[in-house]
Amino acid sequence: MLHQGIILREGHVTRTIYNLIKDKRYEDVIECITSFGEAANTRAGLSTLGHCYYHAQKYEEAATCYEQLCQLAPKEAKYRFYYAQSLYQAGIFADALRVLKQMGDQEDELREQCLQLQSAILYSSEDFAGAQSLLNQRAGGTADTLNDEGCLLFQADQHEAAVQRFQAALQVGGFNPLVAYNVALAHFQKKQRAQALDYTSEIVERGMRNHPELGIGAQMDIPDGGARSVGNPITMAISGITQALNLKAAIEFQDGNEEAARDALLDLPPRAESELDPVTLHNMALTDVEGPVAGLRKLAFLLELGAPSCPKETFANILLICCKNELYETAADILAEHTDLTYKYLSQYLYELLDSLITAQTSAELAEKKLGTLASSLAGKLRSLAAKVQEVRATNEQQALRDALKDYEQALELYLPVVMARAWISWRDDDFVGAEREFHASAEFCSENSIWRLNAGHVLFMQGDKYNEAAAFYEPIVRQHSDDIMSVSAAVLANLCVSYIMTFQNEEAEELMRKVEKAEEMKGNLGKQYHHLCIVNLVVGTLYCAKSNYEFGLSRIAHALESGSGNRLYADTWLHVKHCILGLLTGMAKQNIILPYATVQEVLNFLRFCESYGLFTPANIFSATEQVPEEPLTIGLEARKLRLLLIKLSEYDNF
């Protein structure tokens, strides 16, 4: 018999089947056995099929096989155990528990395994008390028991004790990537990022060494989806690769390194989108380069899957992304449609914060009142915790001091977003003085926080008469990253340059721009593209245009954008250009501005450049809620119109 390239010779069928199983070719075995007809329904056939379905991660099919085996051989306890195990892996917890309870304590050799499986089911069902009760009945000191004890401690937020249990499990049972991942996760929760990354690195290195067939990193080597999918073999599940790289991505994402987070996800074994596990799909949604709409679609899909497939963080993240991208109506609709998830997955704090942001769209006064109440509550808690830190510091009890500082830092993490939300309500109405008041009010707790200082600098900068004060906030950020100035936001560098210029510190501005230019050239030699200098020149040029110095201002803007490939010309940068050009044209139409012939020539040449390189580049930015026209205006078309207007106003009819 020839079956899809597999030769099944008479008398050698069993040997061939077992060789295929040895080579982990479970799908081939399934196809071979199911083609045998009635033989597939024998005890031997069902047993082999159940084993292969389970290891091919087709758990519902495996459960069906073991259910039939339980009927064929009702006295075989192992079949009932495998049946329950398959149901558990398929997420059918209630039926799995029912099967285990029917087994009772009849089989001593399976007692420990049954208790372990029961506690796993209760843990997955979030019945932690029940899981703990069963754990107390199990043999102590084994690697499995120590790991499960660590999981329950982790769930109870006792992360230090959890780390100790997980490490003990590694010592007793040897290296296990899934237990090592648990250690990494506990370190991550303790904000010990370096230790967490050490464990994830070891898991990935061992995975690459032991499982080259998984193609780890292949997506980085063969970009644009060219790498061949490896599917979801059981080796991927037990290698811990998926968990480790997702955790690495989460660490980078929390640190603000979104590109590094995407790279970590690209290191995952290549799979089609339909083959991705829920956690990977969730993290890809958060880092989606196509923008928030594409990410929201992925998260909405996960939300529809429901528990246990949908990661519990999905609900909060879909709401946060909506608010971050000003999709407040969408956020309100999601909250209204999923009231059950609101109580289950949102803390009282997060619900109140999101509710305030949504309320601000219809009543800024009511939103401010809600945020004020929340801020007052958290400020009171911070003062109490600060006093506790001082008390404990006097006792010289180091562990108590660490715990007190941790509590204070956690409360501060909650307070800061509330401060930013209150300042944002004033900011969006261009009430920068009101926003500054919020920063003054919160300085008692937040003045050393880098995010707070950055936004305080922005608020001062926008007032237009506090450039010295703004520079005082921006300068420490730039100094802190003097070894890698490209890691500083281009907006900060641009605002600092403007602050220097507006306070007559032109030499400092020029020096900063030289540093940026030099750093950008060095990074460019390494194959990395940065637009920091472009943005700085754009902002500085816009500033001079606003002061009616169009000759110098437009020369800065042209210098910022004119590059061989035109890759700096896109909707965001074009917005600066056309605002300045329109300002120039308005002044010329009113006969308030007269430009030298040479300057007009330079501006016309620059607009020709924009026309040429922007012929197919969209000229406008559309939000996620706006309807994009079928034939949107391009930069090239707008540049041509502006060039014709400039020709008319300059009376140069020969151009």
UniProtKB/Swiss-Prot annotation:
TPR repeats lie at residues 10-43, 44-76, 143-176, 178-210, 385-418, 450-484, 534-567. GO terms for biological process: cilium assembly; intraciliary transport; protein polyglutamylation. Keywords: Cell projection, Cilium, Cilium biogenesis/degradation, Repeat, TPR repeat. It is found in: Cell projection, Cilium. GO terms for cellular component: axonemal microtubule; cilium; intraciliary transport particle B. One of its GO terms (molecular function) is intraciliary transport particle B binding. Signal peptide: none annotated. It holds the Pfam family TPR_2. The keyword Protein transport does not apply. Its main location: other. The keyword Repeat applies. InterPro entries: TPR-like_helical_dom_sf (IPR011990), TPR_2 (IPR013105), TPR_rpt (IPR019734), TT30 (IPR039941). Gene3D superfamilies: Tetratricopeptide repeat domain. Belongs to the TTC30/dfy-1/fleer family. Required for polyglutamylation of axonemal tubulin in sensory cilia. Plays a role in anterograde intraflagellar transport (IFT), the process by which cilia precursors are transported from the base of the cilium to the site of their incorporation at the tip. This is Tetratricopeptide repeat protein 30 homolog. It comes from Drosophila melanogaster (Fruit fly). The lineage of its organism: Eukaryota, Metazoa, Ecdysozoa, Arthropoda, Hexapoda.
